[in-house]
Amino acid sequence: MTTGKLIDRFEGPSGRAVLEEVLLEQKLVLGNQDLARRLAEVGTLEEIAKDAVLITEDAEDSEVYFIITGHFQVKVHDREVATRGGGDHVGEMAALVPTAKRSATVLATEPSIVLKVSAADFKSIADAYPSVWRQVTRQLVDRLHQRNDMVLPAHQSSHVFIICSVEALPIARAIENNLEHDKFFVKTWTQGVFRASQYALESLEEQLDECDFAIAIAQPDDSVTMREETKNTPRDNVIFELGLFVGRLGRARTFLLEPRGDEVHLPSDLKGLTTIGYRLTKSEDQLPSSLSPACNQLRTIFNKLGPK
């Protein structure tokens, strides 16, 4: 699907006047009629279909595109970092720096029309109209600020999230207490993680971004029968959340605490995780001492790897 005949409005003798009028609204043009006329002379109009890629990250082309109509998504490493629409331009960095590759992918989110200007023509025009350089600098600073706003600051102290069932909360609290004098911020799912105004999954996604490590406490919460054999398993939500954290943090930062002597069945997808054993006790008074060796192992790993 393309914009069809819409491009005809900007082509030919009558369309040139319309194109120049639209270019006057460009952020790099700022109402300069001579500059708009010059861009219209050297540029080439192109139709861009919905979902078509205008610019590909790491590519070596260097044209500058002025968006006449439509809307585009800007993505870095497959993550959206900005959007651009009519009046915006994209691609100027590769035009200005001969050795620069494309820093982002630009994808049309609707049928669009752009004016393509070669790097040589763009630099020639910028030299003739110094206001272009000033506006390019301002735009680049604004975009840098936008990019920085999307980068999470590194933690000074490692954030640790504990995944567990309700039945395992005493164990989670004992781990938290064991690590309270270390430079770790330990959070269990009861500590304001699931707010009333949010769905549980959205709250978990926040923790995925915020945390540097995850500990899943596996204990025989449930029994399941598979192939006529009964096995002890953790609660379903523990397995689900463990999988989420493995996917985001990786196996090196996600740990499974298993009770010694009580085999807990896990899905085959989660095999290969770093497993730390602990001595399961029915007395909460004995939990701090029974978990101390496990906490020592965790402490060593957290200090070695540090915040992500």
Swiss-Prot record:
Catalytic activity, EC: 3.2.2.5
PROSITE patterns assigned to the protein according to its UniProt record, in alphabetical order: CNMP_BINDING_3
Catalytic activity field: NAD(+) + H2O = ADP-D-ribose + nicotinamide + H(+)
Cystine bridges: none
Region (TIR-like): 160-278
GO (cellular component) term, any one: cytoplasm
Alphabetical list of CDD domains matching this protein: CAP_ED
Record-level GO BP terms: defense response to virus
Enzyme class: hydrolase
Keywords: Antiviral defense, Cytoplasm, Hydrolase, Nucleotide-binding
InterPro entries per UniProt: CAP12/PCTIR_TIR_dom, cNMP-bd_dom, cNMP-bd_dom_sf, RmlC-like_jellyroll
Domain of life: Bacteria
Pfam family, one: cNMP_binding
Gene Ontology MF, one: nucleotide binding
Keyword 4Fe-4S recorded: no
Compartment(s): Cytoplasm
Residues binding a nucleoside 3',5'-cyclic phosphate, per UniProt: 54-143
Function: Pycsar (pyrimidine cyclase system for antiphage resistance) provides immunity against bacteriophage. The pyrimidine cyclase (PycC) synthesizes cyclic nucleotides in response to infection; these serve as specific second messenger signals. The signals activate the adjacent effector, leading to bacterial cell death and abortive phage infection. A clade A Pycsar system. The effector gene of a two-gene Pycsar system. Expression of this and adjacent uridylate cyclase PaPycC (AC P0DV40) probably confers resistance to bacteriophage. The genes are probably only expressed in response to bacteriophage infection. Probably only responds to cUMP (produced by its cognate NTP cyclase), acts by depleting cellular NAD(+) levels.
UniProt domain comment: Has an N-terminal cyclic nucleotide-binding domain and a C-terminal Toll/interleukin-1 receptor-like domain (TIR) that probably has the NAD(+) hydrolase activity.
UniProt name for this protein: Pycsar effector protein PaPycTIR
